[in-house]
């Protein structure tokens, strides 16, 4: 009798674990972060904040499609040399909003661990404001479209909660700049391959 009861409990746990990413399930989650640093001897400062909620639906077992939204704010304050015998400080403030449709595939390793690959196409827009302690401020609007693939793994401490660790694997960004102070525009393209294992991305997801 005890053996049958134990077998039943194990079976239920297995079904619960597999149900996390089965067809018809939903996932809600995202990430939030704050960073601040100060560099000597130039007294350069950097601070940033981001929040990125997301929601997805499993269209098939282990395959989810969804949409993420993001907000990013950063401020850089640095020593830019001297002017007229005095110290020159330059400040740059960046504010960006993003929309990120995504597709994600999970591969189960055990009841509590799953590897995944996340493909997303972020669309972002915002502005970057540069100024210094002398007359003159430069404001530029920025728009970008890109694509990225991020591998990672999810740990499930409970049947509905997942803690994720991932790295940026492959990224591509096409960014355009529109300077308000003049008629000149800027345009950059960036393609990068390689995972920075020292800077993992951490997120929390809720499955139901």
PLM features per residue range, with description:
Residues 185-199:
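C-terminal beta-signal and terminal closure region of outer-membrane beta-barrel proteins
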Residues 134-135, 180-188:
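Solvent-exposed, glycine/polar-rich loop segments of beta-barrel outer-membrane systems
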